[in-house]
Amino acid sequence: MDSIDTELAARIRRDIIFGTIKNSERVSEAQLCESYNVSRTPVRLALRLLEREGLVKRGEGRGYHVQSPSIQDIKQAVLVLGHLESLAARLMAQQPKQNESISILKNQIDEIDHLLSTLTFDDASLQLIQQHNAVFHKTIMENCGNNFVNFTCNQISHLPMLEVGLMVFDKSVLSTEEGVERSIFRLKLGNSQHKVICEAIEKGDSVRSEGMMREHLNILVEYIELFEKSDEKLTLSNLITYSGIELSTFEPTKKEASN
């Protein structure tokens, strides 16, 4: 169970991302205590965490100024994530034989293949694919032999589309037969890349594993750019609806949304 300050930081972070707390808005400990009905200690600790994440900046006196990330910030962070995951794949390929970890990777590939063969594109199926995809990517991250790679990824994982192993869907196209076929093709292509990455790691081919992982993750930037072209007023909250993130992680409560 998360501590009170961690839970509070998540609530404030969500409100910043959804714009309930506006960019450049000044917030104080007293104000947040009242808004979230908590004492000063968890507020102070939550603000320190959010400051490290770059979502708030300490101003003059005791106040903070909100620094809501932009779409460009997300694109830049996705590029960083791509380099880190590519590095993790290369480093894992250089590690001594990891039969158990390789077995986990292969199991995720097989499970995704099975789901794609019977896919109906309902929420339950997509969620299962998302889970197996996350296990695949996190297994590489956690077994690369360099804890700082995983640590650095965790520092940006609070942002939309920045969770390791997150999948991206344009749900607007899933209402058409052509859109479903195109999405299935993309998922099959992604899992075929998983197979190449896994085989390269198993063979100790660090160059191949790194290159394929980078190609595999380039799709995230391409999708953000595609969403920007289709929506000139693209916001972070819009971006979340395109990702595999469970909206309950970010979505304001009904009471908050009505304010």
Locations of regions flagged by a protein language model:
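Residue-level marker of regulatory loop/turn positions in helix-turn-helix DNA-binding domains and
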Residues: 1, 25, 66, 129, ...
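Short linear motifs at protein or domain termini
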Residues: 1-95, 229-232, 243-259
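A generic short alpha-helical patch detector that favors 3-5-residue windows
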Residues: 4, 76, 80, 97-104, ...
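Short, flexible helix-adjacent loops and helix caps
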Residues: 17-21, 89, 93-97, 117-121, ...
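A ubiquitous short alpha-helical element
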Residues: 71-75, 93-98, 120-124, 176-185
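Conserved amphipathic alpha-helical segments that form helical-bundle/coiled-coil interaction surfaces
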Residues: 99-171, 190-200, 206-220
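C-terminal all-alpha effector/ligand-binding and dimerization domain
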Residues: 166-259
